[in-house]
Curated annotation (Swiss-Prot):
Predominantly expressed in testis and placenta as well as in many cell lines, including epithelial cell lines. GO terms for biological process: cochlea morphogenesis; establishment of protein localization to plasma membrane; fertilization; heterophilic cell-cell adhesion via plasma membrane cell adhesion molecules; homophilic cell adhesion via plasma membrane adhesion molecules; lens morphogenesis in camera-type eye; protein localization to cell junction; regulation of postsynapse assembly. Glycans are attached at N73, N83, N125, N186, N222, N331. Residues 1-57 form the signal peptide. The chain crosses the membrane at residues 405-425. Belongs to the nectin family. PROSITE patterns: IG_LIKE (PS50835). Cell adhesion molecule that promotes cell-cell adhesion through heterophilic trans-interactions with nectins-like or other nectins, such as trans-interaction with NECTIN2 at Sertoli-spermatid junctions. Trans-interaction with PVR induces activation of CDC42 and RAC small G proteins through common signaling molecules such as SRC and RAP1. Induces endocytosis-mediated down-regulation of PVR from the cell surface, resulting in reduction of cell movement and proliferation. Involved in axon guidance by promoting contacts between the commissural axons and the floor plate cells. The gene is NECTIN3. CDD domains: IgC1_2_Nectin-3-4_like, IgV_1_Nectin-3_like, TM_EGFR-like. Cis- and trans-homodimer. Can form trans-heterodimers with NECTIN1, NECTIN2, PVR, IGSF4B/Necl-1 and with IGSF4. Interaction between NECTIN1 and NECTIN3 on the pre- and postsynaptic sites, respectively, initiates the formation of puncta adherentia junctions between axons and dendrites. Interacts (via Cytoplasmic domain) with AFDN, providing a connection with the actin cytoskeleton. Binds with low affinity to TIGIT. This is Nectin-3. It comes from Homo sapiens (Human). GO terms for cellular component: adherens junction; apical junction complex; axon; cell-cell contact zone; cell-cell junction; dendrite; hippocampal mossy fiber to CA3 synapse; plasma membrane.
């Protein structure tokens, strides 16, 4: 009985599965089968197409893209899933239009590694269905396209490709800036972070928020690059001991690289003198002054001195402390200066020391105990008991009495002066005020005013601007301008007219010895009738007999 050959056309979607020409040639040597019916001839290509596609569609599984790190190892995965017999598996690398065999696994002859890959390529296991290899010590030349190929019988070859990208892990370092950080100086490079020969170029960032970064990048022919980042700041002594951190990020790194740097700010000494509590008195012992200095670099010299240039006995300078060996006396009063020096300069501080009188102490007199005498039972001899009384108390009481007397005298004198001043002010204010009261009697208007309001009509007595006393003294004829014939003149119809705007114009009597338009009348006109006038603070004189609105 003859075998039926299954032809091998290419399957859609299975472009990476190929059949060798030798299998087709071998198939042509077989006996021809009987001629099938016409319906079978039409269905045969479809059945054969379905058979091949089901057998070879996606038979090799690989990772399309693999990232390798220079100098390290990488695994290239290749799993073969076919039902046919696998006669050989191999790895090839594409170089342009040609390929180079990397490694071969034959079920009968074993493993074989070609050329430059010897000693660097190993198959993961001995199974023909797993062609995964490990490539050791990755170099730049290992990047490119690799093909995993499987040879089956009788269907031929099947293959899939993967692309290897070689990354170079950067070499990271952190160094101190070239210049020292001096307090108050210009902007200075504090630290330099370098990520050298990375592929691709690394990314550098800084943590610290004390300054700003400045980066430069240099590229090389092997596609690597070096980045240098400088951290700049304005130095200040308060930033001493602060931490800044360089953070390097790169795809070849499993995690970010972080390098920290402690700022070392140099500054001149900051000096302060302590130890004086303000209660140094004559006779006090065990006191000292201490010179505190904060400097970077540390100070190498401390010197004590006095502002007046004197140096009393009993002063001992040891390191940064000035000891007062002897009990204090008034000679130790003065201004003490401490000068501290380091490589950046000299600073000083001073302290004013005042030695006061010793505090008042109470000394008890020795007392004699009372001893009863038993020599004679009838006459008991005793000594008077002396009560303890401090000697200094009498002086204190005397001083307090004198001080009390002096304070009383001074206080009494001040009180008398104060009372005198207040009395003078009161009298002065009273003299400046008016001498009397306004005329406050109830005013009874004339009978004619009770009948009809004539508030806008001037009365005859209101036209007299001066009292009778003034008129009698002057003895001048009164020139009364208000005449009957004058009021009757037709051109003077505005006089005493209520509806006229000029109704308030009032004629005045004329006196020869007085000037018209005087604002005030002198006091000599009121000698005989002084009580009728009132003098005000502003200097004006008001008559009691007048009514004012």
């Amino acid at each position: 009985m003859a075998r039926t050959l299954r032809p091998s056309p290419l399957c859609p979607g299975g472009g990476k599965a190929q059949l060798s020409s030798a299998s087709l040639l071998g198939a042509g040597l077989l006996l021809q089968p009987p001629t099938p019916p016409p319906l079978l001839l039409l269905l045969f290509p479809l059945l054969l197409f379905s058979r091949l596609c089901g057998a070879l569609a996606g038979p090799i599984i690989v990772e399309p893209h693999v990232t390798a790190v220079w100098g390290k190892n990488v695994s290239l995965k290749c799993l073969i899933e076919v039902n046919e017999t696998i006669t050989q598996i191999s790895w090839e690398k594409i170089h342009g239009k040609s390929s180079q065999t990397v490694a071969v696994h034959h079920p009968q002859y074993g493993f074989s590694v070609q050329g430059e890959y010897q000693g660097r390529v190993l198959f993961k296991n001995y199974s023909l269905n797993d062609a995964t290899i490990t490539l050791h010590n990755i170099g730049f030349s290992d990047s490119g396209k690799y093909i995993c190929k499987a040879v089956t019988f009788p269907l031929g070859n099947a293959q899939s490709s993967t692309t290897v990208t070689v990354l170079v892990e950067p070499t990271v370092s952190l160094i101190k800036g070239p210049d020292s950080l001096i307090d108050g100086g210009n902007e200075t490079v504090a630290a330099i972070c370098i990520a050298a020969t990375g592929k691709p170029v690394a990314h550098i960032d800084w943590e610290g928020d004390l300054g700003e970064m400045e980066s430069t990048t240099t590229s090389f022919p092997n596609e690597t690059a070096t980045i240098i980042s400088q951290y700049k700041l304005f130095p200040t002594r308060f930033a001493r001991g602060r931490r800044i951190t360089c953070v390097v990020k790169h795809p070849a790194l499993e995690k970010d690289i972080r390098y920290s740097f402690i700022l070392d700010i140099q500054y001149a000494p900051e000096v302060s003198v302590t130890g004086y509590d303000g209660n140094w008195f004559v006779g006090r012992k065990g006191v000292n002054l201490k010179c505190n200095a904060d400097a970077n670099p540390p100070p190498f010299k401390s010197v004590w001195s006095r502002l007046d240039g004197q140096w009393p006995d009993g002063l001992l300078a040891s390191d940064n402390t000035l000891h007062f060996v002897h009990p204090l006396t008034f000679n130790y009063s003065g201004v003490y200066i401490c000068k501290v020096t380091n490589s950046l300069g000299q600073r000083s501080d001073q302290k004013v020391i005042y030695i006061s009188d010793p505090p008042t102490t109470t000394t008890l007199q020795p007392t004699i105990q009372w001893h009863p005498s038993t020599a004679d039972i009838e006459d008991l001899a005793t000594e008077p008991k002396k009560l303890p009384f401090p000697l200094s108390t009498l002086a204190t009481i005397k001083d307090d009495t004198i001080a009390t007397i002096i304070a009383s005298v001074v206080g009494g004198a001040l009180f008398i002066v104060l009372v005198s001043v207040l009395a003078g002010i009161f009298c002065y204010r009273r003299r400046r005020t008016f001498r009397g009261d306004y005329f406050a009697k109830n005013y009874i208007p004339p009978s004619d005013m009770q009948k009809e309001s004539q508030i806008d009509v001037l009365q005859q007595d209101e036209l007299d601007s001066y009292p009778d006393s003034v008129k009698k003294e002057n003895k001048n004829p009164v020139n009364n301008l208000i005449r009957k014939d004058y009021l009757e003149e037709p051109e003077k119809t505005q006089w005493n007219n209520v509806e006229n705007l000029n109704r308030f114009e009032r004629p005045m009597d004329y006196y020869e010895d007085l000037k018209m338009g005087m604002k005030f009348v002198s006091d000599e006109h009121y000698d005989e009738n002084e009580d009728d006038l009132v003098s005000h603070v502003d200097g004006s004189v008001i008559s009691r007999r007048e009514w004012y609105v």
